[in-house]
Amino acid sequence: MEKSEKKPMRFSFRRRPKSVSVDRSEAHAADVSIGQYLEKLNYVSQEEAIKIDQELFSEYAYSVDQLMELAGLSVATAVAKSYPRGPMPKGGTVLVCCGPGNNGGDGLVCARHLKLFGYEPSVFYPKQSNKPLFQNLTKQCQEMEVPFLSFLPDSQLVSDSYNLVVDALFGFSFKPPVRPEFNDVMDKLKKVKIPVVSIDIPSGWDVETGGDADSLQPECLVSLTAPKRCSRNFKGRFHWLGGRFVPPALAAKYELNLPPYPGTDCCLLLTPPPS
């Protein structure tokens, strides 16, 4: 028998037939008012936040650096949406104040992404961790020429030199009062005359009840994974939800009732845009 001659393989680039149904649920969700979701949104307790984190690491096999990267990127994106680089004076300067824990790691990731977004971040990281993860995050910033401050200037100099401050000092595991070595830092941040963006929890706040009249009052808050109970008392201009990594089954288990993120965005504005 003669071997049949092989025909060259051809690829078709024709348009999809009009009769094919396309799922537009995500696009539709972006158009739906956020208000209807806020009524059901679950503001989690400190205990719930800890359990959710533990399950992300164990049941869902996330690593700390994975979640930190996604969280820090969402914070940087929320900053860019709230305070666009274009019209920003002072060369787009931003001061990122990092604490010794995972919240500080989120801040380091945020600083790196802000640099990539065209801002000029500086980092104040007074109590650096000796863990490899944090040392790597620090080196990544340094290799991208993000300067690290050896001390925190007074409030007026910070206000004159920077456009805004990212507060990455303490996260949802914090329990008042503030440790003595951070009292001076907190006092200076409370007195700055530029916007403060807090990551997950305004530093110094009780995770359940919030802060008092003497507490840090950020203009922008980026809640991660799910908003914490204290954020009900947030009165600033921008409240974002970030950290788009919660598996649907986990969200259902804790009845988080998270609103759908628009399109491919990694952060979602929970408050109406200021006029």
From Swiss-Prot:
Record EC number: 5.1.99.6
Catalytic activity: (6R)-NADHX = (6S)-NADHX; (6R)-NADPHX = (6S)-NADPHX
Occurrences of domain YjeF N-terminal (ranges): 49-258
Coiled coil: none
Residues engaged in binding (6S)-NADPHX: 102-106, 171-177, 200
UniProt enzyme class: isomerase
HAMAP family reported for this sequence: NADHX_epimerase
NCBIfam families membership: yjeF_nterm
Reported function: Catalyzes the epimerization of the S- and R-forms of NAD(P)HX, a damaged form of NAD(P)H that is a result of enzymatic or heat-dependent hydration. This is a prerequisite for the S-specific NAD(P)H-hydrate dehydratase to allow the repair of both epimers of NAD(P)HX.
Name under which the protein is recorded: NAD(P)H-hydrate epimerase
